[in-house]
Amino acid sequence: SVCHLNMRLSPTQINEFEKNGCLVIPNFLRLDVVESLNYEIEHLYSKFDINKHPMTKFMTEINGKHIGNKYFLESSDKIHYFFEPDAFDSKGMLTKPVDKSINKIGHGLHILDKNFKSITINSTISEICTQLGYRDPRALQSMVIIKQPGIGNEVPPHTDSEFLYTNPVTCLGFWFALENCTAKNGCLQIISGSHKMHTLKKRFVRDTEKGGTKFVHVNEPLKNWNSNVDHEKGENSWQKSSKYT
């Protein structure tokens, strides 16, 4: 098993998840598994061919327009690479090595990479989903997010159900820290209990008229699932990276 033990959530943990919309489980993955995942990330860097890449940057509303080109939209069952916007100079040239410039690798790691598949699809994850009320859970997407030293851009507050929409809302996210992630280097942060207070106000959809993507406004109540929790990832102005998958 990739986990320390084939665990079940305790009643206290389930109550904490339902109350806060998030549950932290320390030391969930074995240390050797974390090391192998970080090694695999380096291997993925080595396979990257910059000459065949459209130089797609991972953009959010903070950058003016959310990413939405063909390379991004066709990444659900592939391993695609997305750059930090600040890794380029004013002429569009990379100013750092590739392994210090990538923001995200995704979104089909659980399909094409055995290392990431092993932490996504296994009996422990399935058991946790069952305890939280899921009857037929499916892995939708997987990614590695890298907060690069000095240029790791901020991701604004949002809910995952804006991007991974179902009705009723049922998306559940699992985040695994692969390095020491802190407020200084852009860790994941949530607004505790926000899944009980907010309505879904917008959805991320394809723009069939102009191409790319856009947000459309909606007004729907949010259900009690992890994807409804407001969360953000701060910028990394520190000289130490953070990674999570």
What are these regions (language model features)?
Residues 24-27, 138-141, 173, 187-190:
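A structural signal for short, well-ordered beta-strand segments and their strand-loop junctions
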